[in-house]
Amino acid sequence: MSEKLKIVYRPLQELSPYAHNARTHSTEQVAQLVESIKQFGWTNPVLIDEKGEIIAGHGRVMAAEMLKMDSVPVIVLSGLTDEQKQR
């Protein structure tokens, strides 16, 4: 039986950006994410590896920092290669 995905909350200070993240976010995009989180809450958790490195959700983390949040919802993915993290 396969393990089910589990959403947990992690402190922002435990997360670090993925060094090879190819995507950038403009100030306008982050502002839109801030407004979305204010209006709808978290609808999409941040994906991180077992070391706390952000795989997907850099913009959401930036928005959370702007909102002065202490923690964010994450899904921890294990055993990914660098190639898989870049996709």
Swiss-Prot record:
CDD domains linked to this entry: ParB_N_like_MT
Coiled-coil ranges from the UniProt annotation: none
Gene: ynaK
The protein, known as: ParB-like nuclease domain-containing protein YnaK
PANTHER family in the record: CHROMOSOME-PARTITIONING PROTEIN PARB-RELATED (PTHR33375:SF1)
Pfam family, one: ParBc
General remark: Encoded in the Rac prophage region.
